[in-house]
């Protein structure tokens, strides 16, 4: 019975697999319903999508988006019954290629890429609408041959509408007051022609006056030019008979606190430098004594008399030369000045052929000092905790990505946040990746250092800057983290790499204390000296005057023989001045000291509690005698040793690295031929234990 059932089931299965299943006929009296086809929800034109494409500069996607929604209408904020019609280069109301080239070349004094995004219809008039590479929206009036800057972005364009367009105001006034006689078209055309000719002449005169200032590539060059050409008058395109008189902050009476107040009024909080102030033919002018300032990104601002806020005038100096002070009276009209022949400018200044340097905009977010510091020490805030978690992330599963991916994601998410460092005071790291700061160095630049070659993969986390100052990517120290969790600092100005810490905790506790160049700063006063370095040597000013005179340095050490001072740094080490006679109690015997004296090494004292003899070489460098003839260089000068001296004994390793093809002498590098065993995966680690810990351990035993 079971076999018969199995056979039937097998036959049924074979028959069903060979022939397709037959559908049952519909029941009598029941009609079969047609199957509904699934359809997608129709897409609707969205202004946010259009603005996002313009911000990302995805012009190919913008062209497809405009073609897909061609003919869609959006009501503008002003005036009523004013409609924006979506359309691109293939719309029926589009411009010709000749008209588009005319708009791109003949209005700004230089070529500016414009992309057609549609038209605006008001009454019986149509205005073509463009967007440039920075997101600004322009409208073209073909009747008067002029451009109007409607808004700085698309969101402002949809909110403000055509409120900056003069013909729209004139048409509304003509409709409300029909009895007012209009200007004859021929007379109006003649006025427009004269206006264009006047604008072209005034622009050429202003461009000739600003040609040397436009050749300055960065803020430092502009500051030097203003300092060298004080009281020089640069003619403006508008108002007429007005000029910019170059003056420094001291001439204008601008203090550092006032410049910081100006900086806080900006959205980006970028550093600003004064260019001068406006002077007219008559003192009784609205623009008299208006101060002009330039930001670190090249943006030009105006400071009105009696106000603490800055007004943005132009995106860069070349744009300021084109518009002058017209934005102060809400004049956003661009006359057609035609193509500018720069042959005369090239003869006067050949460097003008170089393009104006466009610096990347870096936005910094600085919290208040009370939320950053607690009793003079940086708080371990939530941003620090998030950085620690991303720094020390481990892979719990073998298929999960490496820990550097989490660190990169966190740095990109918190780009622009400023975190205070333990040292130096009021210095911190601004988080961000290389794209955020515009760091475009080749990896070969970093692979020239042996410590970075052995570090494996490197991750960029930010730049070091002073509080409320945006770092300069060309000169600011760069902070890198290796795959092992070690922190490095690359200084472009010195072309050196410093090892800041072997872990996140060591980096947070020490800050930039391993960067030796900070300890060779010039002497300022006792207050700054105590706040920065925390030593007790009172004669630092006299010592700074004789750093390169070895005889006087030895005389100072002999005059202070027997006196004890506290060295800088967190380990409480004491240095005692003295000669080799009093150093006999140390482990270094007379024979070793005699051999070192023949090599021009002189004993200047010893350190406690490590009880190590300190020597000065023939060039003024400071060395410490560890054991036998093992010497370690601690500093380049006696001043740097007093300021930093005890730091090496807490973290005994090599800190400073020069390129492999360089023969420069670096601090904290063993100078003897003794080879110490490797205690770590990296070459820059000298010992796995701290000398201070070993000394305290033997003392306790």
From Swiss-Prot:
InterPro entries associated with the record: US22-like
Gene Ontology, cellular component aspect: host cell cytoplasm; host cell nucleus; virion component
The entry's keywords: Early protein, Host cytoplasm, Host nucleus, Virion
Primary location group: virion
Subcellular location: Virion; Host nucleus; Host cytoplasm
Source organism superkingdom: Viruses
Region of interest: Disordered: 1-33
Assembly with partners or alone: Interacts with UL38 and host HDAC1; these interactions are necessary for the HDAC1 interaction with UL38. Interacts with host MTA2.
Protein function: Contributes to activation of immediate-early gene expression.
UniProt family annotation: Belongs to the herpesviridae US22 family.
Name assigned to this protein: Protein UL29/UL28
Lineage: Viruses, Duplodnaviria, Heunggongvirae, Peploviricota, Herviviricetes
The gene coding this protein: UL29
């Amino acid at each position: 019975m079971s076999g018969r059932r199995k056979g039937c089931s097998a036959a049924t299965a074979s028959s069903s697999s060979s022939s397709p299943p037959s559908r049952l006929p519909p029941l009598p009296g029941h009609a079969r319903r047609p199957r509904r086809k699934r359809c997608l929800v129709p897409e609707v034109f969205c202004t946010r999508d259009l603005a996002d494409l313009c911000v990302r500069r995805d012009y190919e996607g913008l062209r497809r988006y405009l073609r897909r929604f061609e003919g869609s209408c959006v009501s503008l904020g002003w005036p009523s019954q004013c409609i924006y019609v979506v359309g691109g280069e293939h719309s029926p109301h589009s411009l010709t290629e000749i008209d588009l080239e005319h708009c791109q070349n003949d209005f700004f004094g230089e070529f500016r890429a414009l992309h057609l995004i549609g038209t605006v219809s008001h009454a019986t008039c149509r205005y073509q609408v463009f967007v440039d590479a920075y997101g600004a929206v322009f409208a073209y009036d073909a009747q008067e041959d002029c451009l109007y800057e409607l808004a700085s972005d698309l969101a402002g364009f949809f909110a403000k509408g055509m409120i900056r367009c003069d013909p729209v105001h004139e048409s509304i006034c003509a409709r409300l007051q029909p009895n007012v006689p209009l200007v004859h078209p021929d007379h109006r055309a003649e006025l427009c022609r004269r206006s264009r000719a006047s604008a072209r002449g005034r622009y050429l005169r202003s461009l000739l006056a600003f040609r040397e200032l436009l050749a300055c590539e960065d803020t430092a060059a502009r500051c030097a030019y203003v300092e060298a050409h004080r009281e020089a008058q640069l003619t403006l395109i508008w108002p007429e008979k007005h000029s910019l008189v170059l003056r420094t902050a001291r001439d204008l009476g601008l203090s550092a606190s006032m410049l910081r107040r100006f900086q806080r009024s900006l959205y980006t909080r970028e550093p600003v430098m004064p260019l001068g102030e406006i002077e007219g033919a008559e003192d009784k002018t609205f623009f008299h004594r208006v101060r002009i300032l330039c930001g670190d990104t090249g943006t030009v601002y105006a400071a009105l008399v009696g106000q603490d806020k800055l007004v943005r005038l132009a995106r860069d100096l070349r744009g300021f030369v084109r518009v002058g002070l017209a934005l102060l009276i809400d004049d956003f009209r661009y006359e057609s000045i035609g193509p500018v022949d720069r042959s005369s400018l090239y003869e006067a200044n050949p460097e003008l052929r170089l393009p104006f340097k466009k610096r990347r905009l870096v936005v910094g977010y600085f919290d208040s000092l009370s939320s950053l510091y607690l009793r003079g020490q940086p708080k371990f805030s939530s941003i620090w905790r998030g950085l620690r978690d991303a720094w020390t992330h481990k892979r719990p599963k073998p298929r999960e990505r490496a820990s550097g991916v989490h660190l990169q994601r966190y740095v990109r998410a918190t780009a622009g946040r400023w975190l205070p460092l333990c040292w130096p005071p009021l210095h911190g790291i601004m988080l961000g990746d290389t794209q955020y700061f515009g760091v475009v160095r080749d990896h070969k630049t970093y692979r020239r250092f042996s410590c970075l070659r052995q570090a494996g993969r490197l991750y960029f986390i930010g730049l070091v800057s002073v509080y409320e100052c945006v770092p300069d990517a060309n000169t600011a120290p760069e902070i890198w983290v290796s795959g092992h969790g070690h922190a490095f600092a690359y200084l472009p100005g010195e072309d050196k790499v410093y090892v800041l810490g072997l872990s996140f905790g060591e980096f947070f506790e020490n800050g930039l204390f391993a960067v030796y160049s900070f300890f060779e700063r010039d002497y300022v006063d006792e207050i700054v000296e105590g706040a920065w370095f925390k030593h007790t040597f009172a004669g630092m000013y006299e010592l700074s005057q004789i750093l390169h005179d070895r005889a006087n340095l030895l005389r100072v050490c002999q005059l202070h023989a027997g006196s004890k001072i506290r060295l800088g740094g967190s380990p409480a080490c004491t240095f005692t001045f003295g000669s080799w006679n009093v150093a006999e109690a140390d482990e270094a015997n007379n024979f070793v000291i005699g051999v070192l004296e023949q090599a021009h090494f002189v004993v200047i004292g010893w350190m406690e509690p490590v009880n190590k003899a300190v020597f000065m070489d023939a060039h003024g460098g400071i060395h410490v005698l560890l054991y036998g003839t093992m010497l370690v260089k601690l500093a380049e000068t006696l001043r740097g040793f007093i300021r930093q001296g005890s730091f090496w004994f807490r973290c005994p390793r090599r800190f400073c690295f020069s390129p492999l093809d360089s023969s420069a002498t670096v601090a904290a590098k063993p100078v003897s031929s003794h080879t110490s065993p490797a205690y770590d995966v990296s070459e820059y680690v000298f010992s796995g234990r701290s000398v201070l810990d070993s000394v305290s351990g033997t003392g306790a035993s």
